[in-house]
Structures are given as C-alpha cells and as structure tokens.
Amino acid sequence: MNFLSYLISGISLGSVYALIALGYTMVYGIAKMLNFAHGDVIMIGGFVIFTAVSSMHTSAGVAIVCAIIVCTVLGVTIEKIAYKPLRNAPPLAVLITAIGVSYFLQNMALLIFGSASRNFPDILNLPDWHVAEGLTVTGEAILTIAATIVIMIALTAFINHTRIGSAMQAVSEDRGAAQLMGVNVNSTISVTFAIGSALAAV
C-alpha cells in the first residue's frame, strides 16, 4: 500500500510539473525562446489567489479565474513589451532580457507582498479518498491528476483542430514560410504566450 501511495503522490507531483512544462515548451516551440519569467508568472498567480482568498474572502473559483486573467494579461504584456522588439535579435539578447524580466517580477512581488512567509490557505477543502486499507488519496492529488489530463487533451485538440492551432504549428515549423502563407506571426506568438501564462495560473 505504501508503494501505491507513493506512486499516486508521484503522479500528482508530476502532473504539476507537466502543467509547468506545457507553458515553457509552447513558448519555446513556437517563439524559439526560453521564457525564464514563466516561473515568476506562476508566482504572481499564486499571490493573486492568496490575496483573493485571504484578504478579499472570495470563493476558490473566483480566485482561480482572477489568477488566470491576471497571468494571461501579464504574459501577453511581457511578450509585447520585452520580447516582441527582440524578434530578430541574437539569442543572447533575448536570454538576458528574459532573466531581466524574471528579476523585475521577483522584486515587484517583494515590494508589493513583502518577504514574510505565508501559509497558503486550503481553498478547495476536498475530502480524502480511502481507496483501501492503509491507502488514502487526497482530493487535491486526484483533482491535480484529472485536471492535467483534461487540460492536455483539450490543448491537443486545440492545436490539431483549430485554425489558431494550425497557425501555431506553421510558425513552429518555419516562421518565414508561415508569414508568406498569410499567418500573422506576431498574433500567433501573443496567443501562445497567453495560453502558456494561463496554464501557469492553473
């Protein structure tokens, strides 16, 4: 039973890493750049949920929606201001800019929220599942795994069966050829950042 418990915990933690990796890989695969600020966007999403629940006393659903909106807007803003002017810049310039954006977000969070540690509230209050004798699975673990599976299926369907998804694949394969075929490269990259940042909030 201990093995199954560890296995489920590992899958749950791996699901979190998978969601984080989705945002990274989408941006890298399409924009061909490492967005080092992605982790900081995740941090901002966490602070938004914490503030909404602890200070504004909103429900978990409202807090999560607020985090998704804030992270999406933040991701698109970062892309427009910091990365778009560097489309044809050397990789080192993009790398330095990405690190700079990361430090900027970290220090802004430090300025706004302070450096004191906080306990993240249990916003969902999901019951534990007693699967068998000696084997209990937390509701959060089940929700994390289920949400990751649903998001991956939805994202795969979006990429393979929508016009924007086809544009993303085209830009990923050959940006110049995609532009010649009428694909708006800038808009496609902005949508990619929006999706990646929304995933960061989740």
Language-model-derived ranges and their functions:
Residues 24, 57-101, 108:
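Alpha-helical transmembrane segments within multi-pass membrane transporters and channels
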Residues 13, 135-202:
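Helix-loop-helix "hairpin" substructures at the membrane interface of multi-pass membrane proteins
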Residues 35, 59, 173-175:
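Short loop-to-helix capping motifs
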